[in-house]
Amino acid sequence: MVSLRILITGASGFLGGHVIAAVRAAGHVACTTARRSGEAAVDLTGPGMVDAVVQALRPDVVLHLAAMARLADCEREPARATAVNALVPQRFAERFGARLVSLSTDLVFDGRWAPYSALAPVAPLSAYGQSKAEGEERVRANGGRVVRLPLLFGPDAEGRGASAALRTAIERRQVSALFTNEYRTPLHAADAAAQLVALVVEPEGPLLLHLAGPERVSRYEFGLRFARRHGLDAKWLQPTECMDALRPRDVSLVAAWPAARDFEAMLADC
């Protein structure tokens, strides 16, 4: 097997740590960028920064994880969201074509026609979703590949991700309000990372696909099942309804292939 240099942008994020581990487990070399840490700690929106990073790290392929993902931040700064979520991935696609896998989100959909296949038309409700949808178009127009991801969970030392944040709140006896009317197809971050690495090293794959967990669940059901699996007190989970017009109600995805493990096994691995 040929060992590749895989550039991972946004490596300091929740998914980034899992991807680095998956890259190394597969026998490849991880070279990283992040806003706050990494081999190249950079703001990729800066003039010429994508080219500078590529020149410095000389990757064979790219996994582009970096994003502006907080919905409120994107609503406040839509131009910044477009720069981060659309223009930066476009520049990587111009350089790498099919040797780029750029991540997108289930929030490019409006939640009215789930479950969504990769061929379903996008209809984002938020500035975040709009910027990611634009990024998808720009990447694909330049021969790059796009992978849409659902809600991710799994262990994290900094308490990030759906399950780690819940565990921290319950252990601190803090109430977590969880939506009963918002549905996703949650996927363990380690499973997502392994699939992403397998995709990026095979540049002949499809230009657009979905990764997703094996079950459609509400945020509240996710919390209950996670708490039960780990013996945590579910009284700190408060069921509530989402009333935010910018949040789609059901963005469950049809995965490109079946999940490697069932949902309970994923929950146990947190």
Language model features by range: what are they?
Residues 4-25:
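N-terminal Rossmann NAD(P)H-binding glycine-rich loop of SDR-like oxidoreductase domains
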Residues 31-49:
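Adenosine-cofactor binding site in Rossmann-like domains, unifying the SAM/SAH pocket
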Residues 44-84:
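NAD(P)H-binding glycine-rich loop region in Rossmannoid oxidoreductase-like domains
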Residues 76-101, 136:
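NAD(P)-cofactor binding segment of oxidoreductase domains
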Residues 90-123:
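Conserved Rossmann-fold NAD(P)-dependent oxidoreductase catalytic core, especially the SDR/UDP-sugar
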Residues 137-184, 191:
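NAD(P)-dependent short-chain dehydrogenase/reductase
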Residues 172, 193-195, 202-245:
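Mid/C-terminal beta-alpha module of Rossmann-like enzyme folds, strongest
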Residues 233-238, 244-270:
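C-terminal amphipathic/interface module of NAD(P)-dependent oxidoreductases
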